[in-house]
From Swiss-Prot:
PANTHER family: ADENINE DEAMINASE (PTHR11113:SF2), N-ACETYLGLUCOSAMINE-6-PHOSPHATE DEACETYLASE (PTHR11113). This is Adenine deaminase 2. Keywords: Hydrolase, Manganese, Plasmid. Its EC number is 3.5.4.2. GO terms for molecular function: adenine deaminase activity. GO terms for biological process: adenine catabolic process. The lineage of its organism: Bacteria, Pseudomonadati, Pseudomonadota, Alphaproteobacteria, Hyphomicrobiales. InterPro entries: Adenine_deam, Adenine_deam_C, Amidohydro-rel, Metal-dep_hydrolase_composite, Metal_Hydrolase. It holds the Pfam family Adenine_deam_C. It is an enzyme of class 3 (hydrolase).
Length: 593
């Protein structure tokens, strides 16, 4: 954890002198927010007060109506006044839009700061992709604390991404002043077992005096203790209320994430048993799909849902503001108080956080749900032309085998995967997938290894009547195709290749839906409404070609099927990989008869 600090822009002597004079009553405020109710996230009070602002500073929080001398007065009658929301762990790329478009979506909803792990861009475009992410955030009304991706790829030796980040690469990123720490460390076993590469990466963060953020999915007991002792200080991969409490007790800063909505009620109950909100609990979105972002928002939606599930509204706001600011080591953020930065949200209902007006750095930047001025987008040419793969054939999606029968391994279940085994017929030199099995193929698309698809068998993925292809495929983002028919899989894959990356749904040889994502195969430079509609069409089309097998009804499972850093078998561009054992099978065929 870094020491609480005040960024240099607030230490300007003239600014401070003006603010002090205004606080004394010897000078006018630049802006006065008058007639509202301040949500005090320190005391838990909601109290009537006016807020005087000079430049980017809050100069005074004083009795309502006691001052009227200001260049601009914002009428806050009937409104609550809160610090701007801080999202402590997220990936802009998950929303499939550029940073400028993302900012225009969340700032009018009250989100003024995000902690961005651009490891999706890093996995495709390497250091250049991370540098682009940093530069693209410059000048936006949304403040971004950008982190240095720590696990590119997530499982070295088991997959090939578009780059490899060793300790030297991470140290280089940490030397950039805009980089606020090391992003989620997903190679848990590497840290726990003292792998030299991961040990050096964590040490680079500690040496730089910047936080090392975690990904502690499923860790408990001695493994959890070892992970934290190694220097990791946060986690968002919570699987239950008991897991939340155990990780609080381990001293981790918690990022309660909205992307796993089914767990939020359990977290609310767990926090209720404590009787108070620990100061190490913050909130994050992690991943928000474009249609969800367009309809529901970002961190503001997480706040609303937590309150709906029974969390005190004051606690939810404290977690999303003051606690988050302390986690970031930012003394200037997270509080409506003199001397703090004027990131301020006015909203109507404390139980249904809907922003009326948003100020960032003391300037009114959004009102009535929209930006007052559109954010300026960065150039995107460095992110184009990342599909370094030729069109594929039907045979690329078949599993070669000899004899008449084969013993094969399977990947059982979409989540918390485990090894399975079955027998399958062989015909014409190829495996005949058993009934109820789904084919998954992953083809390297970054030009750093051979691009022949590695094909495996999935159990528990329902009945498929077509194919789905995507280059959004965590975390190496190789071309991944699901389906039951090699013909449909070929059509889907080649549609995505031709589009320069993205997603396609195919049925009976016809493309039913296509979403081009030409920037790293992850993001579009189109407006949010257009991307949201395109992704919604993909969801709808996918729902027509597959009957999900309960309880796995979440389309999101497709994008995590290749996340090789998680325990259990996962298909990658090198084969079927298991990070816990280091096992890697190029083919699912064990033996033939």
């Amino acid at each position: 954890m870094t020491v609480l600090q005040q960024p240099a822009d607030l230490d300007d002597a003239c600014l401070r002198a003006r603010a002090v004079a205004a606080a004394r009553g010897d000078a006018r405020f630049d802006v006065l927010v008058a007639g509202g109710t301040v949500v005090d996230v320190v005391t838990g009070e909601c109290r009537a007060a006016d807020v005087g602002i000079v430049g980017a500073l809050i100069a005074s929080v004083h009795a309502p109506g006691s001052r009227s001398d200001a260049d601009t007065v914002i009428d806050a009658a009937g409104a609550y006044i809160s610090p701007g929301l801080i999202d402590t762990h997220m990936h802009v790329e998950s929303s499939m839009v550029t940073p400028a478009v993302y900012a225009a979506a969340v700032v009018p909803r009250g989100v003024t700061t995000v902690v961005w792990d651009p490891h999706e861009f890093g996995n495709v475009s390497g250091l250049a992709g991370v540098r682009w992410a940093v530069d693209a955030m410059g000048g936006l009304p949304l403040r971004a604390v950008v982190l240095a991706p720590s696990c590119v790829p997530s499982a070295p030796g088991l997959e090939v991404a578009g780059a490899d980040f060793d300790a030297d690469a991470v140290a280089e990123m940490l030397s950039w002043p805009e980089i606020g720490g090391i992003a989620e460390v997903m190679n848990m076993r590497g840290v726990i077992d003292g792998d030299p590469r991961m040990t050096a990466i964590v040490e680079a963060g500690l040496k730089a005096g910047k936080p090392v953020n975690g990904h502690a999915r499923g860790l408990e007991g001695a493994d959890l203790q070892a992970f934290v002792t190694a220097g990791v200080s946060s986690d968002h991969e919570l699987v239950s209320g008991d897991d939340l409490i155990a990780k609080l007790r381990a001293g981790l800063s918690i990022e309660l994430r909205g992307s796993h909505d089914h767990l939020l009620p359990e977290f609310v109950i767990a926090l209720g048993t404590l009787g108070h909100l620990p100061q190490t609990v913050t909130l994050c979105t992690d991943d928000v799909f474009p249609d969800d972002l367009h309809r529901d928002g970002g961190l503001d939606d997480v706040v609303r849902r937590l309150v709906r599930y029974g969390l005190k509204a004051e606690w939810a706001l404290q977690a999303a503001t003051l606690n988050a600011a302390r986690r970031l080591g930012r003394a200037d953020l997270g509080l409506i108080a003199p001397g703090r930065r004027a990131d301020i949200v006015l909203f109507e209902d404390i139980r249904d956080f809907r922003a009326l007006h948003v100020l960032a750095n003391g300037r009114l930047v959004a009102s009535g749900g929209g930006m007052l001025q559109a954010p300026v987008a960065a150039g995107v040419s460095p992110l184009r032309h990342t599909m370094k793969i030729e069109p594929l054939t039907e045979d690329d999606f078949r599993i070669a085998a000899t004899g008449s029968t084969a013993r094969v391994v399977t990947i059982d279940r979409p989540r918390f995967t485990r090894w399975g085994e079955t027998r399958a017929e062989v015909s014409g030199g190829y495996l005949v997938p058993p009934k109820g099995m789904t084919l998954i193929a992953v083809a390297h698309r970054h030009g750093r290894a051979d691009s022949r698809p590695r094909v495996g068998l999935l159990e528990g993925w329902g009945e498929w009547r077509g194919a789905f292809a995507t280059t959004v495929s965590h975390d190496s983002h190789n071309l991944t195709v699901f389906g039951s028919s090699p013909r449909d899989m070929r059509v889907a894959a080649n549609a995505v290749i031709e589009a320069g990356g993205g997603m396609a749904v195919v049925a009976e040889g016809k493309v039913e839906a296509l979403l081009p994502l030409p920037l790293c195969g992850l993001v579009s430079d189109a407006p949010l409404a257009e991307v949201a509609a395109g992704f919604a069409a993909i969801r709808e089309a996918a729902g027509r070609i597959v009957e999900w097998q309960p309880p796995y009804l979440v389309f999101k499972a497709c994008f995590g099927a290749t996340l090789a850093c998680n325990a259990g078998p996962h298909q990658t561009d090198r084969g079927i990989a298991d990070v816990a054992t280091g096992k890697l099978l190029e083919s699912p065929v064990l033996e033939t008869f």
